[in-house]
Amino acid sequence: MKQTDLPSQPESLPGQLLRRRLLGIVLILIGLSWFLFELLSRGTIAGINLNLASADSAESISPQRFAVSRVEVTGINDQVILSRTTGEEVILSGERRGFGWAAQSATAAAMQVTIEVEQRGDTLYVHVRHQPQMMWHFGRDPYARLELALPSEVTFNVALMSGDATLQQVMASGTITTISGDVIASDTNGQLTIETTSGDIEVRNHDGSLRVVTVSGDLEAVGQFTDLQVETTDGDVVLRGKYTTARIITISGDVTIAVDDADQMRVETTNGNIRFTGQLAREMQEMVTISGDVELTINKPLDAQINFTTVSGRMRLPAQFAHQSANTRSLTQTFGQGRTMLKVETTSGDISLRLRE
């Protein structure tokens, strides 16, 4: 007679609950231990300083000189400072910075940053390498602070992720690229290109050409621009100075322009507002928007051929011009000798004009 083995008895329910409870306690203890280690060694949570990391470490980088014509810098959250030198060599210096509960942990954090420097031909490559971090960690990450003094003949390219870039009296030409890092340039000269995703850009007293591309970062620029090109999605743009040619394109960002002198200017927005103050461009000035408003405050005397058109928006004109518009949706008129062409087009945005002494 064939025997059939009886199924084994399942583990009792109290035993299963006990095993699960013990496993949960072990996982909680591991998580708390990791949390306390990160908290004590770094001292911040989600970027909020709890003043627990009372020590930091700065490992200095000895100055090095290179005879090159181009510099390439790449990093993550690192800080890059470019300045001018009257010499013929690029000078590299800086430091690695780490943070922790005590000096030993801060030094260990700084050692997680490696600065790789290599000259290949006439190009200097500087790459900041970071040791991989845990997916979820707390505290301030270590970073490198690089300082490069550049001769005017050298070109540069700096690419960062969340790190900031600063340019001080740089006479060289080049490109700065960041994702969320900010860019500040002061007293610069030459051809400068800045590209960010969300990082803000501030340019003070630039002399030369400037090209800016950003998604949501704001731009504030002052200077004498031979060729100005700005492209944003929803970042606001504030400009002041002199322009040979200027072209600004944005979707929802507002554009504010103060002009002392210009030859040609074109501003395009989708629903961003345009505010213009100052002297009209000598040759051609064009402003086009769909739903954004256009506000013009122009210096007297007005010497221009004006062509204002709006589909459903309203026009606000000085009292002395009101009778010259047969159509409240458009105005075509020549004032003075008509040396400048001023063209403004909107779909639903309003157009307003004011003259000032």
Language-model-derived ranges and their functions:
Residues 256, 273-276:
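Short, surface-exposed loop/turn motifs that are enriched in glycine and acidic residues
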Residues 2-75, 79-160, 166-178, 184-196, ...:
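Acidic (Asp/Glu) and glycine-rich low-complexity loops/linkers
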Residues 288:
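Conserved mixed alpha/beta core segments that line enzyme active sites in large multi-domain catalysts
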